[in-house]
Curated annotation (Swiss-Prot):
UniProt organism field: Homo sapiens
Chain segments carrying region Disordered: 60-110, 140-188
Effect of R182E: No effect on subcellular location
InterPro entries: CDCA7/CDA7L, Znf-4CXXC_R1
Disulfide-bonded cysteines: none
Annotated tissue distribution: Ubiquitous with higher level in thymus and small intestine. Overexpressed in a large number of tumors, in blood from patients with acute myelogenous leukemia (AML) and in chronic myelogenous leukemia (CML) blast crisis.
Listed name of the protein: Cell division cycle-associated protein 7
Length: 371
């Protein structure tokens, strides 16, 4: 019996399954089983409601982002600040106008005060100057008006200083006024301030005189000839023949002092001006000459002795001025007991001589004739 019941049950189950095939299915939307958690979460209604809530949340978030409290707070004060700034600007305009008006008034007042003070100071200064001038004119011996020259005849001359035979006269006497230059002579318009003839005669032969002693002038035999031995530092004297003189060396001779180029290491020294330049110098053909004593530059040899360096270089028998005994440099003149000449070329040309040597020679002849 049990064996028969089992297949009958199976047949019933199969029949039920066949019946279930033709049963109309119920859609998920019409399901009312809200208690089932799976049905509630998997249903379309729940999905739709979930999407709608998410969309609403997104909308609210976007609205919060676009129209959040910060944006609203930023926009509303901006409108209020514009109105406030306009009101402030309107309120400042009359205040600024009033300030500018007050400043302009104060500036005008300060300008008027400054001009008044300036005029008052000028008036006081003029009054003080007039008072001082009146007091100065009241003193006895004061001059009235401006004299054109300091050395006019109206002024008392200072007595001449006596010169004793044992004391050398001063070559640069004390000045009573500023030296007369070209600019001052143009301003003054007269040459009365030039030295007098007596003073010129007194200083005229100072260049050719010997040193004074207690007994009188020193003779040439009494002059102390200082014989100094030639040291090992002295450069050897090299006599260059005329054949070794090149055209480049002749072209390198300076005709003007402005053409000189100074060089301490490569230049050669001129005996007259003691300047070390790179221009061509003379070469003494005297065997007894030594060192750089026979080297003279172009301007010095022309202005001092009236000779040319090119002619001296091409002359095989040319001797330098120290070897001839006519050197007028400061060292040689001091060795001979005479004073230095200084820049004497302009005075020599003023008296009609072309060089200093000719001028000194004429002075010496005049001095010997008077003596």
């Amino acid at each position: 019996m049990d064996a028969r019941r089992v297949p009958q049950k199976d047949l019933r189950v199969k029949k039920n399954l066949k019946k279930f095939r033709y049963v109309k299915l119920i859609s998920m939307e019409t399901s009312s089983s809200s208690d089932d958690s799976c049905d509630s979460f998997a249903s379309d209604n729940f999905a739709n409601t979930r999407l709608q809530s998410v969309r609403e949340g997104c909308r609210t978030r976007s609205q919060c982002r676009h129209s959040g409290p910060l944006r609203v707070a930023m926009k509303f004060p901006a409108r209020s600040t514009r109105g406030a700034t306009n009101k402030k600007a309107e309120s400042r305009q009359p205040s600024e106008n009033s300030v500018t008006d007050s400043n302009s008034d104060s500036e005008d007042e300060s300008g008027m005060n400054f001009l008044e003070k300036r005029a008052l100071n000028i008036k006081q200064n003029k009054a003080m100057l007039a008072k001082l001038m009146s007091e100065l004119e009241s003193f006895p011996g004061s001059f009235r008006g401006r004299h054109p020259l300091p050395g006019s005849d109206s002024q008392s001359r200072r007595p001449r200083r006596r010169t004793f035979p044992g004391v050398a006269s001063r070559r640069n006497p004390e000045r009573r006024a500023r030296p007369l230059t070209r600019s001052r002579s143009r301003i003054l318009g007269s040459l009365d301030a030039l030295p007098m003839e007596e003073e010129e005669e007194e200083d005229k032969y100072m260049l050719v005189r010997k040193r004074k002693t207690v007994d009188g002038y020193m003779n040439e035999d009494d002059l102390p000839r200082s014989r100094r031995s030639r040291s090992s530092v002295t450069l050897p004297h090299i006599i260059r023949p005329v054949e070794e003189i090149t055209e480049e060396e002749l072209e390198n001779v300076c005709s003007n002092s402005r053409e000189k180029i100074y060089n301490r290491s490569l230049g050669s020294t001129c005996h007259q001006c003691r300047q070390k330049t790179i221009d061509t110098k003379t070469n003494c053909r005297n065997p007894d000459c030594w060192g750089v004593r026979g080297q003279f530059c172009g301007p010095c040899l022309r202005n001092r002795y009236g000779e040319e360096v090119r002619d001296a270089l091409l002359d095989p028998n040319w001797h330098c001025p120290p070897c001839r005994g006519i050197c007028n440099c400061s060292f040689c003149r001091q060795r001979d007991g005479r004073c230095a000449t200084g820049v004497l070329v302009y005075l020599a040309k003023y008296h009609g001589f072309g060089n200093v040597h000719a001028y000194l020679k004429s002075l010496k002849q005049e001095f010997e004739m008077q003596a």
